[in-house]
């Protein structure tokens, strides 16, 4: 369990921060961007839960995802090394498998897509669409970090984020199930 007695430490006041293994790196390191974006995604999901009046089964999945995103952040901030002194928290395939099962379960209850969807509809759907775009950015940040630091990073973190963006899109559609999706009308058809 984490025990924080003080929030500020002053150790980052010169532009560096500690990774999970206590090594120091620049705050501009791509790994820092990746887990910062994952943290922002978690906040966006929390906003959707708090303000979105979402169905209980959706909220239950999102709360699990919020916990998963802390695991993703812990994984991203801890370099992969052989024989670590303490076994770090790592995203494993079963995290992705759970997301895929959720995607399949919720998508089975939706009408088939016949057009692109505009972000909007109910407040909950709009907030989930926004969270989806933040997760997509977190995924891109993670892939960028993997290009540079791939030998010390777990690529399943990026796979998890990729699948999570799919799930959030499906959950946004679920939040709009009663009123229907807001469909894109191509330029020539808008009049």
Language model regions located:
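Phosphate/pyrophosphate-binding loop motifs in nucleotide- or prenyl diphosphate-using proteins
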Residues: 1-191
